[in-house]
Structures are given as C-alpha cells and as structure tokens.
C-alpha cells in the first residue's frame, strides 16, 4: 500500500520513486 499518488493506478503500476516496498510493503 500506498496513497493513490497517480490517480487511480493500482499498486503494481505505482512508481518506486513514491512507493518503496521496503518502506511500505
């Protein structure tokens, strides 16, 4: 998870720049 930073993109298309799995699995 993560906040919807792209406007509706699912988690698997969110950029690691904003969604680092080490920080927010």
Curated annotation (Swiss-Prot):
UniProt entry keywords in alphabetical sequence: Hydrolase, Protein synthesis inhibitor, Toxin
Enzyme Commission (EC) number: 3.2.2.22
Positions of region (Disordered): 1-25
Catalytic reaction annotation: Endohydrolysis of the N-glycosidic bond at one specific adenosine on the 28S rRNA
Membrane-crossing segments per the record: none
Keyword Hydrolase applies: yes
Function: Inhibits protein synthesis but does not possess ribonuclease activity. Also inhibits HIV-1 reverse transcriptase, beta-glucosidase and beta-glucuronidase.
The family this protein is said to belong to: Belongs to the ribosome-inactivating protein family.
Protein's name in the database: Ribosome-inactivating protein velutin
């Amino acid at each position: 998870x993560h906040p919807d930073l792209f406007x509706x993109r699912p988690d698997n298309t969110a950029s690691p720049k904003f969604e680092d799995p080490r920080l927010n699995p």
